[in-house]
């Protein structure tokens, strides 16, 4: 996202600065980065990918610098803390993941969702999965599927990735060796971000994947060649791709508009892309 923001900023002789610590998203690190950025008085606008809405909104109390969110917005109760959101329609990402699942299992089946707790954007993706599979726009986002249109979520699901590669692979191994669901829907890229490690972890279960006894569908950012190789080898079965560079580009433009006092849309959605082996074969 930052790369797209910086490339767009350079067109206007401007700079897009990336703040915050390295590693997994952390609300306390984000809170501290916002405090320091405000105190520096160096910035004309802020763009925040929200980690924990009710906590982070306190860091913005009394701010007079324009604020937008990208990728992960504030939750509905505090959405007025930003002037606008730029990024994917997170419920649509979940819906796209669910639609891929439906093409493989039109009568439904057993399901496990892979997510990470606290992130508002991921809650919306999970909601999109459940609403689409249940065929109910009012299905509560935190209510597991219990047979709606043939879909059941296992007792040990959803799984929590925790933005930690070791935990992710431990959870993946447990999914294959103990949970035995028909479908794994990961609302983030954690399982495949290290494709070699994913191959190693799933090696004992490759027959189930290749014969589609078990299906894996993943939301990701830019589609890497290692991901399409996993598709070709039928070790995963579908991807929903988010264009983070475009998010960055649009985020800069909205910050620039807000700084100039121009009105900006409350929501600016970027496009998602669906990729399956069948779609690859048809190209």
Residue ranges, per PLM feature:
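Flexible loop/hinge segments that line or gate small-molecule binding clefts
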Residues: 54-92, 224-232
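Periplasmic-binding protein-like
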Residues: 41-50, 66-71, 112-115, 179-189, ...
């Amino acid at each position: 996202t930052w790369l797209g923001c910086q490339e767009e900023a350079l067109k206007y002789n401007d700079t897009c600065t990336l703040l915050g610590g390295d590693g997994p998203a952390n609300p306390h690190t984000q809170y501290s980065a916002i405090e320091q950025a405000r105190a520096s008085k160096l910035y004309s606008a802020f763009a925040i990918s929200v980690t924990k809405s009710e906590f982070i909104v306190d860091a913005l109390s009394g701010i007079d610098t324009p604020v937008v969110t990208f990728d992960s917005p504030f939750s509905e109760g505090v959405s007025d803390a930003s002037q606008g959101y730029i990024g994917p329609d997170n419920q649509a990402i979940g819906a796209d993941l669910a639609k891929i699942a439906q093409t493989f299992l039109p009568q439904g089946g057993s399901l496990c969702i892979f997510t990470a707790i606290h992130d508002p954007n991921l809650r919306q993706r999970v909601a999109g999965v459940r609403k689409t599979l249940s065929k109910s726009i009012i299905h509560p986002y935190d209510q597991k599927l219990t047979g709606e249109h043939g879909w059941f979520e296992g007792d040990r699901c959803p799984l929590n990735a925790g933005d930690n590669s070791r935990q992710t692979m431990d959870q993946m191994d447990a999914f294959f060796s103990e949970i035995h669901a028909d479908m794994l829907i990961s609302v983030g890229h954690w399982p495949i971000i290290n494709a070699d490690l994913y191959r190693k972890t799933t090696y004992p279960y490759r027959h189930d994947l290749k014969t589609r006894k078990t299906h894996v569908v993943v939301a990701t950012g830019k589609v890497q060649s290692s991901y399409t190789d996993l598709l070709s080898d039928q070790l995963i079965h579908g991807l929903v791709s988010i264009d983070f560079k475009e998010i960055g580009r649009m985020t800069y433009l909205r910050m620039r508009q807000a700084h100039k006092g121009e009105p900006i849309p409350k929501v600016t959605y970027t496009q998602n892309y669906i990729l399956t082996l069948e779609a690859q074969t048809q190209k």
